[in-house]
């Protein structure tokens, strides 16, 4: 067996309670579509179609299961009592916003699940995983424990993988996972890389902060993860996100920048000090080839970048060169579409652009890149994880049938109070864990 390294996309399967409750402050699309009806079945099938599209391009593709929602255990911890049906009824009557938070399917956005460092970058030669604590938004803070269980179930081999507990919850160590992290290398995933951690604020002050929306990632969280993952300080860069970008709706840096191998595609407003950031990246690359592709405000206004999710596409390496997998909204935005045409016309490392329909996710503020967690693994490490999570033709067909069997095609936030929805979800997840060979990972299955 060769020990080449590959970047694998672990996509979150959209959960049965996918809805538009407008929970995410700072996420413009989430607020815009609040209280509209959603289509969980369509959302899950769109996500599955994206996975299959990437797999057909030759990209290695795997899945992460949804989380159990509504989170009745969380409602119990918050003072609601009785059986599941009674708890849902009381929560719907007394605090429907809290019920919506406990019913969110936001774990579908796997880019926020964790930060992952490949073995090539870690001093101990293992791949490291830290599940994100996501404390800024209550509905997302509920995900960390189950995310940890899922990652430990998939990457169970202790020789190859090291798992760290989520950072302490609170304002100092706010961690939003890989949505604020990218890794560059000099042309091959298996080479030593430069890990770029982008943060929105220093929890101890001293730097300008956004005025309108919260900065979700702290410098302290990023520094802690770099230490936990045994990274060489010479191969780590901490970069502050431009507060203006956050206030414009770029609540994660992957809304305004995306990197892959030796390419960084970024908006001119992405970083607080772009010249210094690029200088440090170029210094790390030295004589090795590096492509920085800046998109100016004149080419694509920041408001268009945020609404089109141009930068929230997936930048992937195919046999024919690098491809950008962008949402349909980027094609439909005149400035973004014009830029992409010009990008392809002038040549360069990005050889093709493909547009994908993930509109149900986009309406909640999650583009193609939000739906996946990038994990770089060697062939040896790939052989050490559960093979049942990789997207094969059989799994693709099986998941499609599973979605059509268990998911509703119309859901309002108020429907989260329906005890039948809870039972439908548990039945679906129980079947899914058997399909994926993950064992008991949910509270209703006895996991703790």
Regions found by a protein language model. Give the residues of each.
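The feature marks the mature, well-folded catalytic cores of soluble enzymes
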Residues: 1-448
């Amino acid at each position: 067996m060769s020990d080449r390294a590959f970047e694998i996309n672990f996509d979150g399967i959209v959960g049965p309670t996918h809805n538009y409750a407008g929970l995410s402050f700072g996420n413009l699309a989430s607020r815009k579509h609040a209280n509209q009806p959603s289509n969980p079945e369509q959302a899950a099938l769109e996500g599955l179609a994206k996975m299959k599209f990437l797999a057909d391009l030759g990209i290695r593709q795997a899945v992460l299961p949804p989380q159990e929602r509504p989170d009745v255990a969380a409602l119990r911890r918050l003072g609601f009592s009785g059986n599941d049906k009674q708890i849902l009824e009381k929560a719907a009557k007394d605090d429907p916003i809290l019920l919506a938070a406990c019913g969110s399917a936001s774990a579908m956005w796997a880019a926020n699940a964790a930060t992952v460092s490949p073995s090539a970058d870690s001093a101990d030669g293992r791949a490291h995983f830290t599940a994100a604590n996501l404390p800024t938004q209550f509905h997302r803070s509920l995900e960390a424990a189950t995310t940890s269980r899922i990652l430990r179930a998939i990457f169970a081999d202790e020789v190859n993988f090291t798992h760290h507990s989520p950072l302490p919850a609170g304002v100092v160590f706010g961690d939003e996972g890989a949505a604020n992290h990218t890794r560059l290398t000099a042309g091959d995933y298996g080479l030593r890389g430069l890990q770029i951690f982008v943060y929105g604020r220093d929890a101890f002050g001293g730097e300008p902060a956004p005025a309108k929306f919260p900065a979700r990632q702290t410098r302290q969280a990023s520094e802690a993860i770099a230490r936990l993952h045994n990274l060489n300080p010479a191969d780590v860069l901490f970069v502050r996100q431009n507060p203006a970008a956050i206030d414009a709706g770029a609540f994660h840096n992957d809304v305004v920048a995306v990197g892959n191998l030796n390419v960084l595609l970024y908006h001119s407003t992405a970083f607080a000090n772009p010249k210094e950031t690029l200088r440090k990246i170029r210094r790390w690359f030295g004589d090795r080839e590096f492509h920085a592709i800046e998109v100016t405000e004149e080419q694509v206004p920041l408001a268009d970048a945020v609404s089109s999710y141009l930068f929230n596409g997936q930048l992937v390496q195919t046999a024919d060169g690098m491809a950008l997998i962008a949402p349909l909204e980027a094609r439909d935005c005149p400035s973004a579409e014009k830029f992409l045409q010009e990008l392809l016309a002038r040549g360069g490392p990005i050889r093709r652009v493909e547009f994908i329909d993930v509109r149900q996710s986009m309406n909640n503020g999650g583009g193609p890149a939000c739906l996946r967690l990038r994990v770089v693994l060697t062939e040896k490490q790939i052989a050490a994880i559960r093979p049942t999570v990789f997207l094969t033709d059989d799994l693709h067909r099986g998941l499609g049938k599973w979605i059509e069997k268990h998911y509703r095609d119309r859901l309002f936030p108020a429907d989260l109070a329906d005890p039948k929805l809870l039972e439908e979800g548990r039945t679906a997840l129980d079947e899914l864990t058997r399909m994926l060979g993950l064992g008991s990972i949910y509270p209703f299955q006895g996991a703790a």
